[in-house]
Amino acid sequence: MMRPIVVKEKQIHVVEDEVRQAKTMDRDIVKHAMKQSFAKLNPKVMIKNPIMFVVEIGFIITFILSFLPSHSSSVPGWFNITVSLILLFTVLFANFAEALAEGRGKAQADSLKQSKKDVFANVVKENGDIVQVSATDLRKGDLVIVKQGEMIPSDGEVIKGLASVDESAITGESAPVIKEAGGDFCSVTGGTMVVSDEITIVITSNPGESFIDKMISLVEGAARQKTPNEIALNTVLTSLTLIFLIVVVTLPIFTNYLGFQIDTAVLVALLVCLIPTTIGGLLSAIGIAGMDRVTKFNVLAMSGKAVEAAGDINTIILDKTGTITFGNRMAHTLLPVGNETIEQVGKWAAISSVLDETPEGRSVIEYVKTKSISYNREIAEQGEFVPFKAETRMSGVDLQDGTKVRKGAVGSVIEWVRSQGGTIPKDVNQKADFISKEGGTPLVVAVDNRIYGLIYLKDTVKPGMRERFEQLRQMGIKTVMCTGDNPLTAATIAKEAGVDEFVAECKPEDKIAVIKAEQDKGKLVAMTGDGTNDAPALAQADVGLAMNSGTTAAKEAANMIDLDSNPTKIIEVVGIGKQLLMTRGALTTFSIANDIAKYFAIIPAMFTLAIPQMEALNIMKLTSPLSAILSALIFNAVIIPLLIPLAMKGIAYKPMSSNALLGRNLLIYGLGGVIVPFIGIKVIDIIVGLFI
């Protein structure tokens, strides 16, 4: 017997409301785009798109000719006005495509503005007094206390406390994230809300410079800068337009020599059909839509250039922890060395971790607790904490009695112990190798000049990583894993995950060296990062994807920011970049291929009366010369709105080699660009023939 499916009425209403709001927003965007289509007819706006500007000039000329009597004209009076209207709609359709793409960005900006409500901040003055001021009066360096239920007034970094923060206004993710002082996860964003506990933050941006302000200005696209590839393609298309313009302008000289004249409206129609109006009308929309697709992935691109660069990436540099593995390295077991005991290792491991707020440090405390190993917490709390640094690759505590306790990478701690005059137990490297071969991370525990044992930190490779790296390999992209682990651990993880290369015991300067080495080979490099120590490498990379949960320095150095703080998203970003480039290339191919059919429609129509042999080119058997010209023009106009969904969504992309992609696109959009207009123009000709 089947059980009835019960759905709460409230849930149904919520879903219905969301669907209704989405439909309303889409309708509003379309209405706004239609209005903007006419507003963009302003020549000052149109001249930014030379191809469509030529079409607009053609509309003006034919429109004026419609009201000027001409006894020498060989075409009826209605022909000029019909041509002018078709040209007007051609321009309007192109404007609509651009306005529609811009409208989606503005809709996202409007939703972001909702998070910029008037909020007040509890500012801590130098004398300790707390004063409530408006968020707009905050300046960089101000100290602010944010309590449970309060909105974070501006961008900042946590310097005291720990709290759960709801970032759904920025990321769309409802689950709160933990923000705490110290480390790489101290950054908070204005417009987010503290849902538990209390934190003290230092403001890192002045009014108008916050993260949300930057997001709004970027997604609105009001001052969108064209990318280098877009400029280059636009230059080529403009050059083609200029060449065809010269051809059409000089054509009457030759026709006069042959003893017949061509009407101005026919010449304008010929020019419009020859120039690449399809891609000219969709070029801006493709670029804006590419930025929009990245934004929908919750990635903020600082420029269209960054998105395009992602499509040309040859090498991706990935951190092991948190990207390839889950990053939750936990203490798995303790391994004593020499004649030491587990209790001794556990005692000193715990003392070195009492003040260590990292997940690894906390896991050591939890592990020691589960094993009921006793240690003196008080002496650790009274000591001076030595934080982990990428340069030293170890952390610990200096106790008040002068004892120095350290835990860290095998090589670093061994070197430190030797510098203290100590000796190294014979089984240290043996046990470290055992942990590494298991795919774990060994941390050596030492006190002054004596090594007590190792902590076995265990991490797990994320499922599906091998398949994703194989897809990148098919795309011709090399993957390089950078990790602070020793070579054995790095090799084990690299083999399991399926990366092409790895760099073990990697320091921040090593990442920069890897990036420069790849760039010296003429390759474009992408990398992810979240810490201040990643900032130089993020700035050096062609595509630097910083995590929103990371430090301000990392986000300022990168040219993309992932609002979900998911490092593996760099793979999706590369796919979106390739999709953008492929869409532009495919529609350019389609647009130029269209011209072949238009030649067979318009050329015979223009010259058949003077040169009867030209009738042989009328392979579509179009009804009449006037019908042929109008059919070609109508197809030229109608194809633009028909291709808007493809320009906005992007063409389907599957991981494959560049040669395979080129062959596939030439077959679909090259051959398709030849066949479709033959069919379309013929169908339109049949319909037009019924009226003339």
Swiss-Prot record:
Catalytic reactions of this protein: K(+)(out) + ATP + H2O = K(+)(in) + ADP + phosphate + H(+)
Protein's cellular compartments: Cell membrane
Transmembrane spans: 50-70, 77-97, 240-260, 266-286, 600-620, 628-648, 672-692
Gene Ontology cellular component list: plasma membrane
Example of a GO MF term: ATP binding
UniProt: Mg(2+) binding residues: 530, 534
Ligand binding (ATP): 356, 360, 388-395, 407
PROSITE patterns: ATPASE_E1_E2
Classification via Pfam families: E1-E2_ATPase, Hydrolase
Membrane topology qualifier: Multi-pass membrane protein
InterPro entries, per database record: ATPase_P-typ_cyto_dom_N, ATPase_P-typ_P_site, ATPase_P-typ_TM_dom_sf, ATPase_P-typ_transduc_dom_A_sf, HAD-like_sf, HAD_sf, P-type_ATPase_bsu_IA, P_typ_ATPase
Catalytic residues (UniProt): 319 (4-aspartylphosphate intermediate)
EC numbers, comma separated: 7.2.2.6
Enzyme class: translocase
Organism domain of life: Bacteria
Keywords: ATP-binding, Cell membrane, Ion transport, Magnesium, Membrane, Metal-binding, Nucleotide-binding, Phosphoprotein, Potassium, Potassium transport, Translocase, Transmembrane, Transmembrane helix, Transport
Role noted for this protein: Part of the high-affinity ATP-driven potassium transport (or Kdp) system, which catalyzes the hydrolysis of ATP coupled with the electrogenic transport of potassium into the cytoplasm. This subunit is responsible for energy coupling to the transport system and for the release of the potassium ions to the cytoplasm.
Subunit structure, interactors included: The system is composed of three essential subunits: KdpA, KdpB and KdpC.
Family that this chain belongs to: Belongs to the cation transport ATPase (P-type) (TC 3.A.3) family. Type IA subfamily.
Stated name of the protein: Potassium-transporting ATPase ATP-binding subunit
Organism (species): Bacillus cereus (strain 03BB102)
